[in-house]
Amino acid sequence: MNTSHYSVLGHTVPYPKVYDPSLLFPISRAVGRTQIGIGVVLPFVGEDRWHAYELSWLDARGKPCVATATFHVPCDSPYLIESKSLKLYLNSFSAEVFNRAEALRLRIAADLSACAGAAVAVEFGLPPVGGGDKEISLDRLNVDIEDYGPPNPDYLSNVAQNFVEEMVEETLTSTLFKSNCPVTGQPDWASVTVRYFGVPIDHEGLLRYFISFRHHAEFHEQCVERIFQDVLQRCAPQCLAVEARYTRRGGLDINPLRTTSEMAWPLSVFRDPRQ
């Protein structure tokens, strides 16, 4: 079983001088999911969307080319891709010759698919920087905070209502989210968005819950799945989508999305201003 302890993460390694797909390191999703009660049947659909800012290769005449790219790793793949290994892998193209950029795209797609154990879509370019027009920022709340971990789902609740329960659709966001790499301890900063339809969720409790990740060590993808599970179990929305847009490290940022229904709950694809 592949775990992060056997990866290059947290180790000093030389940058590759030649193309090497064996640098890619898969980590089983099952390990983290077992810890939060997720079995073989997933309660969500979604993807891990990677933005790559440092991609370079040589054309047929030896002239360097540069590009940005977006990778879409399906959340039902058996493996997630460890970030430092992906950085090193992409850097291994710096002296590789391609007659066409399309040949490079196909090569990357094939290698990432082999690592993840499922089809990974690759495209050149990045989504625009933006934000949702109807988002409600939780950062505006005037609250006292004393709990920074471990993640505490007891903060999550619905707003108390009298008589008939009113159903609402809301998109709640916070830029205050922080978790930590489970191997190196480095901070991982993100903007987190929760979109739902159901009985109103208590905003202050959700913000406190987000901040309770501040000392928590877990991979990006696992944090989002933990949030999804906790909100679904504690607040019981009819529809739910959770997305985190993590800030860039090593020329990459990752944006895990988990949603109850891909058709009914597509979130706008954009980059956070901090990315």
Swiss-Prot record:
The entry's keywords: Cytoplasm, NADP, Oxidoreductase, Queuosine biosynthesis
Chain's gene name: queF
Pfam families: QueF, QueF_N
Keyword NADP part of the UniProt annotation: yes
Task performed by this protein: Catalyzes the NADPH-dependent reduction of 7-cyano-7-deazaguanine (preQ0) to 7-aminomethyl-7-deazaguanine (preQ1).
Location relative to the cell: Cytoplasm
Family statement: Belongs to the GTP cyclohydrolase I family. QueF type 2 subfamily.
Name recorded for this polypeptide: NADPH-dependent 7-cyano-7-deazaguanine reductase
Keyword Ligase attached: no
One GO biological process term: queuosine biosynthetic process
Pathway assigned in UniProt: tRNA modification; tRNA-queuosine biosynthesis
Organism (species): Xylella fastidiosa (strain M12)
GO MF annotation terms: preQ1 synthase activity
Domain of life: Bacteria
Subunit structure, interactors included: Homodimer.
EC assignment: 1.7.1.13
GO CC annotation: cytoplasm
Active-site residues, Swiss-Prot/TrEMBL: C181 (thioimide intermediate), D188 (proton donor)
Enzyme class: oxidoreductase
Binding site for substrate: I81, E82, S83, H220, E221
Residues that coordinate or bind NADPH: S83, K84, R249, G250
Matches recorded under InterPro entries: GTP-CH-I_C/QueF, NADPH_dep_7-cyano-7-deazaG_red, QueF, QueF_N, QueF_type2
Catalysed reaction, written as an equation: 7-aminomethyl-7-carbaguanine + 2 NADP(+) = 7-cyano-7-deazaguanine + 2 NADPH + 3 H(+)
